[in-house]
Amino acid sequence: MGIFTFEDESTTTVAPARLYKALVKDADTIIPKAVEAIQSVEIVEGNGGPGTIKKLTLIEGGETKYVLHKIEAIDEANFGYNYSIVGGIGLPDTIEKISFETKLFEGANGGSIGKVTIKIETKGDAQPNEEEGKAAKARGDAFFKAIENYLIAHPEY
């Protein structure tokens, strides 16, 4: 098994507390409203804290698919949220687990800087596929942008 680590950073004009609330605390209701492809987010195991498994149901290419997302850690005081993809379409056959360590920081003019460390654990001697990595980054960037756009369009939230 190999472990490969990647880091990424995004910026937004949305304040960290507001963004964190949408991405973590109210994710089950905000994400389906903000991200067109995601139809629902539901808890399948747990109480919403670490260890909880959520099922994100989405439409991709006209088909209904899902991703299983396990909450690893929540640090509300420091705007931290760690989770893993543990099942569904988010895991290619060569990947055992994909973990995300995310944190929001104060950015310029009251905005936010979002930092994420992604750890990919492969099965056996498999290497991560560069195209899969690029596609995953593009999905992550589009997700972040969709939440940002929703919050900008809904200042009352």
Swiss-Prot record:
GO-annotated biological processes: abscisic acid-activated signaling pathway; defense response
A GO term for molecular function: cytokinin binding
Q: Name one GO cellular component term.
A: cytosol
A Pfam family of the record is Bet_v_1
Q: What is its main location?
A: cytoplasm
Which residues of this UniProt protein bind trans-zeatin 1? D8, Y83
Signal peptide segment: none
* This enzyme's EC code(s): 3.1.27.-
Name the positions where trans-zeatin 3 binds.
Answer: H69, Y81
- Enzyme class, spelled out: hydrolase
Gene3D superfamilies named among the record's database cross-references: 3.30.530.20
Entry binding sites for trans-zeatin 2: E60
From the Swiss-Prot or TrEMBL record, state where the protein is found: Cytoplasm, Cytosol
Entry keyword Hydrolase: yes
Q: Where does Ca(2+) bind?
A: P32, V35, I38
Q: What does this protein do?
A: Class II ribonuclease (RNase). Binds to cytokinins. Interacts with melatonin.
Q: What is the name of the protein in this document?
A: Class 10 plant pathogenesis-related protein 2E
Q: Which organism is this entry from?
A: Lupinus luteus (European yellow lupine)
Q: What is the lineage of its organism?
A: Eukaryota, Viridiplantae, Streptophyta, Embryophyta, Tracheophyta
